[in-house]
Design a protein with these regions (language model features):
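Short, glycine-/small-residue-rich phosphate/pyrophosphate-handling segment
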Residues: 95-96, 110-154
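N-terminal beta1-alpha1-beta2 submodule of the flavodoxin-like/Rossmannoid cofactor-binding fold
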Residues: 1-107, 152-180
Length: 180
């Protein structure tokens, strides 16, 4: 099984990244292959709502903006499962996660959202504070994942207070994901 993780925190070595790494460790323990990318290190532009707002992507199946988005989509096409991690900012996804999902939903909308149908996904929202907005952020992430037809394997909210036992749980989730 090949699992692709997309991490959307500007802190490559922080809590959000460690959560993705924990899932991927479990996947590798079961013989799976993994890749992790950090959205904030890539060149991403926001959707410009081209073609009178509907987007050329909906008819052409690709985004016309020249950045790293299409190369990520190509990598995603070859994967069996996904992990999406985002820090929680004011009860919502990170800015880079929102930009990524806004563009992905537009391109996939022209394909009747079929590219990811049945592909298992773990969504993780990590809050650096007490976690008051984590559930709202996780709800937003779930909304994107379900509308894009991912098969949501698990949704996990994590705070700085729950990280130790959640890291262990996420490694087990990665093992289970890879064994299905």
């Amino acid at each position: 099984m090949k699992v692709f993780a997309i991490q959307s925190s500007p802190n490559r070595d922080g809590l959000t990244s460690s959560l993705a790494q924990s899932v991927l460790k479990g996947v590798r323990a079961e013989g799976g292959t993994t890749e992790l990318i950090h959205l904030n290190e890539l060149n991403f532009k926001h959707c410009i709502a081209c073609d009178n707002g509907w987007g050329i992507c909906r008819t052409e199946g690709v985004c016309i903006l020249e950045d790293d988005f299409e190369s990520i989509r190509e990598k995603m096409a070859d994967c069996d499962a996904f992990v999406f991690t985002t820090p929680v900012y004011f009860g919502d996804l990170s800015e880079s996660a929102k930009v990524f999902f806004d563009r992905l939903r537009r391109v996939e909308g022209g394909k009747d959202f079929g590219s990811f149908k049945g592909k298992k996904t773990i969504g993780i929202a990590s809050a650096g504070g007490g976690g008051g907005g984590a559930v709202r952020a996780l709800y937003a992430l779930e909304n994107y994942l379900r509308r894009l037809n991912f098969d949501v394997f698990d949704l996990v909210s994590v705070t700085k207070f729950s990280k130790d036992h959640k890291l262990e749980m996420l490694e087990r989730a990665g093992r289970r994901l890879a064994s299905e």
